[in-house]
From Swiss-Prot:
It is an enzyme of class 2 (transferase). GO terms for biological process: paclitaxel biosynthetic process. It comes from the Eukaryota. This is Taxadien-5-alpha-ol O-acetyltransferase. Pfam families: Transferase (PF02458). Its EC number is 2.3.1.162. Keywords: Acyltransferase, Taxol biosynthesis, Transferase.
Length: 439
């Protein structure tokens, strides 16, 4: 299909404060929230919605409903209406000033179909979310931006930008589900938000070592990087899971299977020498690893970083099951070491993302962004926005649910050098055919 330019007319941005007066308070961030790779970053997402077939929703204005809902939910989440401040010791805290979250309404001159499912890299998509000027003093920036862009067909896109110091991905999805509940007319949230950052007392470096987010640094790029994707459909991923579980006699998750396949395929595509070692880093939700576990509704940062390492020759000559077991063991190791405050090997803390032997994976497929329903049904597609170029790097793979017009399964969004893209897809397809044929 011929690519059509996106034309978006943006209204003036406004600050939306809580719908009820709230006392001004100061809230401390946790030691994880204050890590360098967290406190100075934001993360963005686009949620795409089709026009509703319901006659009652035809005349409904999503921008108006979401703006009103935003004011209501900020009563429950006052930090998102506040601003960051720096303490004398250099830590950040949130002053709940009620200044508000930034809200923007926009209208596109196109139908929603112009967007496809965000698999193509198109800089014009950045028009769907206002980009915060990160060169500005963070004290002057809102901690949340919401932009609603309507299309001529009745569909719309909700673009959101969260300051990472206030929440992680799971916390952001929790907030958006609550925002959607308010937009649908609910008078009470189904999940009460919990701030309580004092529950995460990790001043001990033995704890903080498990939450190193510095791997988000972008490497030096010497070759054209292309955004592309690869889908492992639901039937195939289940075939492969069935095959490997018959061998190992234990449960394997879709993420473990897909990440092992990606690890092997990328290592082959990059032709890394057999004598070297390759490493993958991926996030794990540590909420249940704390003692006691963090309560439901806690939306602060609590994602630990698991590390799986293998020799290239062993990885490529071994089975898919072997790679899966290395990943499974790294998850167990992170959990056990965290609980016992064990000191890990310095090599495991080497997260230099400038090296092609180190790869970072992130799993968005189970966070729940696609379950956010403002009254038009669930999002038909969810995608990050590469405004700050943190994720647009050859060492980063993002696992998502495919768009609704694609087969169910796992969509692997990646940024590869043009010369490696074809080889990677060939290797993935070869593994899929090999394991599906066994069943």
């Amino acid at each position: 299909m011929e690519k059509t330019d996106l034309h978006v007319n943006l209204n003036e941005k406004v600050m939306v404060g809580p719908s009820l007066p709230l006392p001004k308070t100061t809230l401390q961030l946790s030691s994880i929230d204050n890590l360098p790779g967290v406190r100075g970053s934001i993360f963005n997402a686009l949620l795409i919605y089709n026009a509703s077939p319901s006659p009652t929703m035809v005349s409904a204005d999503p921008a108006k409903l979401i703006r009103e809902a935003l004011a209501k939910i900020l009563v429950y989440y006052p930090p998102f209406a506040g601003r960051l401040r720096e303490t004398e010791n250099g830590d950040l805290e949130v002053e709940c000033t009620g200044e508000g979250a930034m809200f923007l309404e926009a209208m596109a001159d196109n139908e929603l179909s112009v967007l496809g499912d965000f698999d193509d890299s198109n800089p014009s998509f950045q028009q769907l979310l206002f980009s915060l000027p990160l060169d500005t003093n963070f004290k002057d920036l809102p901690l949340l931006v919401v932009q609603v862009t309507r299309f001529t067909c009745g569909g719309f896109v909700v673009g959101v930008s969260f300051h990472h110091g206030v929440c992680d991905g799971r916390g952001a999805a929790q907030f958006l589900k609550g925002l959607a509940e308010m937009a649908r007319g609910e008078v009470k949230l189904s999940l009460e938000p919990i701030w309580n950052r004092e529950l995460v007392k990790l001043d001990d470096p033995k704890y903080l070592q498990f939450f190193h987010f510095e791997f988000l640094r972008a490497p030096s790029i010497v070759e054209k990087i292309v955004q592309t994707y690869f889908i492992i459909d639901f039937e195939t991923i289940n075939y492969i899971k069935q095959s490997v579980m018959e061998e190992c006699k234990e449960f394997c998750s879709s993420f473990e299977v897909a990440s092992a396949m990606t690890w092997i395929a990328r290592t082959r595509a990059f032709q890394i020498p057999e004598s070297e070692y390759v490493k993958i880093l991926f996030g794990m939700d540590m909420r249940n690893s704390f003692n006691p576990p963090l309560p439901s509704g806690y939306y602060g940062n609590s994602i630990g970083t698991a590390c799986a390492v293998d020799n290239v020759q062993d990885l490529l000559s071994g089975s898919l099951l072997r790679a899966i077991m290395i990943i499974k063991k790294s998850k167990v190791s992170l959990n056990d070491n965290f609980k016992s405050r064990a000191v890990v090997k310095p090599s495991e803390l080497d997260v230099n993302m400038n090296h092609e032997n180190v790869v970072a994976f992130a799993d968005w497929s189970r966070l729940g962004f696609d379950e956010v329903d403002f009254g038009w049904g669930n999002a038909v597609s969810v995608s990050p926005v590469q405004q700050q170029c943190e994720l647009a790097m050859q060492n980063y793979f993002l696992f998502l649910k495919p768009s609704k017009n694609k087969p169910d399964g796992i969509k692997i969004l990646m940024f590869l050098p043009l010369s490696k893209m074809k080889s990677f897809k060939i290797e993935m397809e070869a593994m899929m055919k090999k394991y599906v044929a066994k069943v």
